Amino acid sequence: MINLRKTHPLMKIINHSFIDLPTPSNISAWWNFGSLLGVCLIIQILTGFFLAMHYTSDTLTAFSSVAHICRDVNYGWLIHNLHANGASMFFMCLFLHVGRGIYYGSYLYKETWNIGVILLLTEMATAFVGYVLPWGQMSFWGATVITNLLSAIPYIGTTLAEWIWGGFAVDKATLTRFFAFHFILPFIVMALAIVHLLFLHETGSNNPSGINPDSDKIPFHPYYTIKDALGLIFLFLILLLLALFSPDSLGDPDNFSPANPLNTPPHIKPEWYFLFAYAILRSIPNKLGGVLALLASILILLIIPLLHTANQRSMMFRPISQTLFWILTANLITLTWIGGQPVEQPFIIIGQLASMLYFLLILVLMPSAGLFENYMLKPKW
C-alpha cells in the first residue's frame, strides 16, 4: 500500500516539515515558541478578518465602529479582546524566541536569523499600523509622533512624512492606508515565516548543547507535536485569562477617548512591546540621533552573528556570557519600564544609562566575554 503522506506532492512537503522531520532529541521547551508564533499568527489573521468585516476605516466612524463591534456584533467583544491581547501574546513569544536564539547561539544559522530579523521588523510595522486603527487618542497621537520621526531624515524627511500621511498631517488618508497595510502585512509575515522555516530545515534545528546533533535525532511527530501541544495549552490559557478577565490591562486608558487633534495626552507612549525601543529613542536629546538609535536597537540583531567570538556555540557552558545575557534581559525590562514613564528625572538618566548599557553589552562586553572564556579554556600547562 502506497503511503499518501510520503508520495503526494503537497502532503510530502507537510510530512518533511512537521511529521518525519529529524529533530534533535534534547531540545527543551524553549524550542516551543516557533510553533506558538505560528498559532498566534493564525489567531491574529482569523480574528482580524472578522473584525475587518465590521470595521470602517474612516476618521468619523472608525472609533464608533470599534464600539459597535464590542456592543452589537455577536461575540464581537471576544473577537476584539482576543485580537488586542493576541498581539501581546505574539510579542511575548517573539521576544522569548529571539532571546532563546541569542542564548543558544541559533544566530549562527545566518540565513534563518536574518529572515527572522526581517520578520520581527515586519511584525513591528504590522502592530504599529494596527494600533492606529481604533482612532482613539493614543492611536492618533502615537501615529503622529512616530510617523513624524521620518521628518528627521535630512533633505527628504518632510516630503517622506507627508507622503506617508497622504496630506499635511495624520488624517483620513492616513487611516485608510494604515488599514490597507494592516490587512496585507500579516500575509507578508506568513510568507516570510515559510521562508524562515525553509532555511531552518536546510540546516536542521540547533539544540541546547550547541553540538552537532546529527548522531541523535528523533521524528518530530509524535514526540514534539505532543510537546508543542502542551505549550499551546498554556498559550491559550494565558490568552483566554487575559481576554476574558482583564482585557484592557495591557492597553492605554487614553484610547477610550476618540481622537482629538486639538488635545494632546499628557504622556504619549506606544504599546508595551515597543516601550524598550521608545525609551532608547527618547534617551537621545537630538531628533535624528534618536531615530538612528531606535533603528540601531533592532538592526543590531543583524550583526550579532559577526560578534560571536566564543569557540562554543551555546551559552550553556559559558557562565560569564550567561551572566551578561541575564543583565541584558534585566536591562531590556528596565528600558520597557522607563519607556512608560514621563520625561522627567530620575527617569531620563536611568533611560540614558540603560540605553548605553544595551549597546555596550551587545557590541563590547559579550564579544569580550567570549574571547575571555576561550582563553580560560586553553590548557595552561
Curated annotation (Swiss-Prot):
Membrane topology qualifier: Multi-pass membrane protein
Transmembrane feature ranges: 33-53, 77-98, 113-133, 178-198, 226-246, 288-308, 320-340, 347-367
Cofactor: how and how many bound: Binds 2 heme b groups non-covalently.
Keyword set, alphabetical order: Electron transport, Heme, Iron, Membrane, Metal-binding, Mitochondrion, Mitochondrion inner membrane, Respiratory chain, Transmembrane, Transmembrane helix, Transport, Ubiquinone
Location in the cell: Mitochondrion inner membrane
Amino-acid positions noted as binding a ubiquinone in the UniProt annotation, renumbered to this chain: H201
One Gene Ontology MF term: ubiquinol-cytochrome-c reductase activity
Cofactor(s) this protein requires: heme b
PROSITE patterns noted in UniProt: CYTB_CTER, CYTB_NTER
Note: Heme 1 (or BL or b562) is low-potential and absorbs at about 562 nm, and heme 2 (or BH or b566) is high-potential and absorbs at about 566 nm.
Subunit description: The cytochrome bc1 complex contains 11 subunits: 3 respiratory subunits (MT-CYB, CYC1 and UQCRFS1), 2 core proteins (UQCRC1 and UQCRC2) and 6 low-molecular weight proteins (UQCRH/QCR6, UQCRB/QCR7, UQCRQ/QCR8, UQCR10/QCR9, UQCR11/QCR10 and a cleavage product of UQCRFS1). This cytochrome bc1 complex then forms a dimer.
Name by which UniProt lists this protein: Cytochrome b
Organism the protein comes from: Antechinus stuartii
